[in-house]
Amino acid sequence: MSLINSTAIPSGATGYEIDQSLRFNGGANSSASPYLSLTPASAGNRKTWTLSCWIKRGSLGSYQTIFAQKDSSSENGEIYFDASDVLYWHLGGGSNYRWYTTPKYRDPSAWLHLVFSLDTSTAGGRAVTDMQRIYVNGEIVTDKGSTANPVANYEGNINKAEQHEIGSRDGTHNFLTGHMAEMHFIDGTALTPTSFGETGDYGEWKPIAYSGSYGTNGFYLPFKQDYTVEGFSTVTYKGNGGTQYIGGTGFSPNLVWAKYRNASGNHSLFDTIRGATKRLYSNATDAENTHTGTLKSFDSD
């Protein structure tokens, strides 16, 4: 698994560019193949969510997982290419609600923008045949089949408080081979591709920056190496409302200065002597106070 420069994903009219991707060099069933995993601390919305990512296939003709939930009962929720190179989306949870495309995706030189939009809630108003939507390069896939349609308010396995994988079915099977860029998971909202891309001047589909919220278990993976460490570095950090790692300092920092850049608020100073939960205000004369919502820990790069 490695970061690759020059993905050649064209930028949109906004000037937004995706200039790096993550390469998955998986084998069919090798436990040594690379993949990513995450386990939510608590379950999110299992009726309504959106997954968006860019994929460039590296090999064809085998089962390859994009995103999956590893269930103890083996009833995985899973999004994958099958051996005939169609896209499958299995909701999991003990029911065979499985949606698949008729088109086959067999061009290893092309980038595909994939959006999987789920809404089984009655409030969403979707027909049972339309609760699972797949979009490819901005277009909804209507040439499709299914083994069974989900019932209203059905809760699939993805977004449970259990292990999820990117690039593998369960850590032992169906490893992805290819490149992936810009993965967004939106918890609690069923979106369309226009939240992530737009049509260019020549009819091509191009990425744009996502500006919405992510919900409880949502996340954004840019798959981008965003710094180069050369000794001591000063790092500025743009928050997104979630817990994130700040790297690029080149060492384990002894002092962190946190301040708002687009809103009013106190400037908070943290140091290794007092600890990550003790802060001072640089713009006030107050004594130190205990605060756990800004800095989690001091760690080495």
Give the label of every model feature segment.
Residues 48-52, 111-113:
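Intrinsic-disorder/low-complexity, polar/charged segments enriched in Ser/Thr/Lys/Arg/Asp/Glu/Gln
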Residues 4, 63-67, 141:
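Local beta-strand/beta-hairpin segments that build beta-sheet-rich folds
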Residues 48, 67-69:
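Glycan-recognition patch characteristic of GH18 chitinases/ENGases
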